[in-house]
Amino acid sequence: MNLSAMPDFPKGTPAFVEMLKKHEPFIQHWDLSRPSAPDELSLLPGGISLEPAFPDPEKLLDTAYADFRRFLSEAELSGGKIPVKVKETAGFPEEAYRLTIEKECIVLESSDTEGIRRGLYYLRDLIAASPFLKQGVHDRKPWLKNRISRCFFGPIKRPPFNIDELMNDIDYYPEEYLSRLAHEGINGLWLTMYFRDLPSSIFPGRGKDAEKRLAKLRLTVERCARYGIRIYVFLSEPKLFGSSHFAVPMEDAKDHPELVGASIADGRFGTFCTSTETGSLSFP
């Protein structure tokens, strides 16, 4: 492939990012031609009100509460007499929760913030389907602990464009986009970094723009945490020594030749020797 013939990557923020920032309002499609059954809790005509009593000093649930209240407003159910009691109960596994729909109230309980978040999303989906909720107990827990995805337009810092998402001003994680990911069950996102971009006592020339990278990384971590999403840094390290774009230049090891291990690919590359003391110290 002739990479020189490829067009340049578009500059600036893609236009579709503005679409990602927009909220998609709830539109009712309820079947109101029937009355509620005796074993159902009807949310009509009075509506429901959220009563959060779960301890959350870091305010990680603020986004989930705001999202739920906005949904109630769009569904014309806010400020009603039926309470949704959100409380802490010990003994649940991580992210597990119990949603109890009673005759006159709804109780959501969990042992951690993410269980409450998942429970609110589940309750929202139940109400979106019908304002008549069948009374009973819903005990739920995730069957997959780490549900990791990736920003669909986030660069991976590889040829031909080599764009580093931590070095530009593009917002890859708008609030509404994160809200949608969280609703779909995503609790992790990954992004790419390289050791050569981080400060190193073994390679003093590295990490020139580390402060800028780490500042945006911290901002991303903090924003995603508000939606129950962790950030995973992908590091395919240590690199080989050689002349390819994916390798560490051989001259970088001129002061530490012990870092160059076995020769491979007819001598074109040298492995990074982690068995030496210098090698073990080279990891950030």
Each language-model region and where it sits:
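Generic detector of low-complexity/intrinsically disordered segments
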Residues: A5, L43-P45, D62-T63, E74, ...
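Feature activates predominantly on carbohydrate-active enzymes
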Residues: L20, P25-W30, P35, P55-P57, ...
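Short glycine-rich, basic-tinged beta-strand/loop micro-motifs
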Residues: L44-F54
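Short, well-ordered secondary-structure micro-motifs within conserved domains or adaptor modules
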Residues: L50, R70-E95, L99-K103, V107
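Structured segments of extracytoplasmic/periplasmic soluble domains
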Residues: D67-A75, L126, R180
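Intrinsically disordered, low-complexity boundary segments flanking structured domains
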Residues: R34-E40, L72-L77, V86, F132-R140
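Short Lys/Arg-enriched alpha/beta "domain-start" segment
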Residues: A37, A53-S73
